[in-house]
Amino acid sequence: MIIGGYMDIEIRNKIDRIWEYFWTGGITNPLSVIEQITYLLFIKALDDVELRNEKDDVFLGITSSRIFDKEHQNCRWSVFKDYEAGKMYKNMQENVFPFIKSLGNSKKSSYSKYMQDAIFMIPTPLMLQKVVTGINGIPMKDRDTKGDVYEYLLSKLSTAGTNGQFRTPRHIIRMMVELMKPTPQDIIVDPACGSAGFMVEAGEYLRKNHKEMFNNPREIEHFNNTMFYGFDIDTTMLRISAMNLIQHGIENPNIEYKNAIGEENEDKNKFTLVLANPPFKGSVDLETIAKDLRTTTNKSKKTELLFLALFLKILKTGGRTASIVPDGVLFGSSNQHKAIRKEIIENHNLEAIISMPSGVFKPYAGVSTAIMIFTKTGQGGTDKVWFYDMTADGFSLDDQRQPVKENDIPDIIERFNNRDSKEEQNRARTEKSFFVPKEEIVENDYDLSINKYKEIVIEKKEYEHPKVILKRVMDMEEEIQSILKELGDIL
């Protein structure tokens, strides 16, 4: 992966050059740049599939169905990439773009349904030619490289300020996935999926830790078609997330335009794993919220509370959640805050609260957050809750976010995985991690903030006797007077 990893500097430079073409051409919104590049990557990917099918047909002596019919051969990347600028631009406007938008009604591409309202924004023939040539010069033969290229593009959203909210830092996503350990049987959902970072990382985890599933036709079918679900209300992000998943080798992800907390969302008892960083932007219109979510949260309008209720609704019994929440969810004193905490603690199994430092989402947000991990049971199960006080994530906690040695993430994963051990069970509350019994949490109005339970040890410091300190000060004063006298004699 790119975030936290390395990438061929030559490929990185080529992507930066393409980015600069957009910038100097007047398209400076990072989201718009990525969207336009996404369209072109999709067009290229279609032709790559067609070329592969043609080779297979020759080898097998058959004729399979085609993406491009005879009338649309000029829509193929391999055909128009060498056109002169004016001809390429006219062909893109009049033929290629209308063609890929028309694919939305077919099943020729899992991504095509997100193309129907796509807008071609590249303003000049010369700019289009430069971008096409630039993309054509990036070697994207295998899944890893395709994924890395798209990850690097998306990383530019992180440094873009206003659009940064779409991305959870990659290393935080990876930590959450490793804590939850997705299995080949899981049905994974992110109800506010943004650029699909959680699903991508879950897919990568399965490739690394469950290689055997990719030799099983049934599990491959599940991985490509029925494992990954993502919802969002931003069509641009739907296109970007779909392409991100496809570039990472997930052929047909279920990415849908859906207000997850709205009445129209009929999903219930469907998924086995929620991985999410839902929006915590404030209030939404009560009338648009699903009635059962209103009931669970005591008529809350706050998205951060409504999404927690949503997770309980859409999970199957035994399904698990790892979600980022703002600190206010943990200690908020309103009836609505208490209602959702009580629901999770009393009727399900709250397993862990990982408190994160406020700098994790810098430079674009300084809010303090935590990770909540719980299992839907419908019949309680919370005995005691594991807390961890994370103070370092491997990067400086200022706006620069430079790599540093201090990093609690490996320790968090190790301790969480071994929380049944005697050592972990018996840790003092002065340590990084510790358990708090349910009864104590209930007594504290279901408060889940770590500072409510963490004990601070104040080290006793020994000071010298005042007479000794006074003697030292007087000696210093005597020395100063002596130096001043010497200076006076010289002058």
Regions found by a protein language model. Give the residues of each.
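Non-catalytic, mostly N-terminal accessory regions of nucleic-acid modification and defense proteins
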Residues: 1-184, 253-265, 355-359, 382-396, ...
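Conserved Class I SAM-dependent methyltransferase catalytic core
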Residues: 33, 37, 233-240, 255, ...
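C-terminal, active-site-flanking charged/polar segments
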Residues: 349-350, 362-412
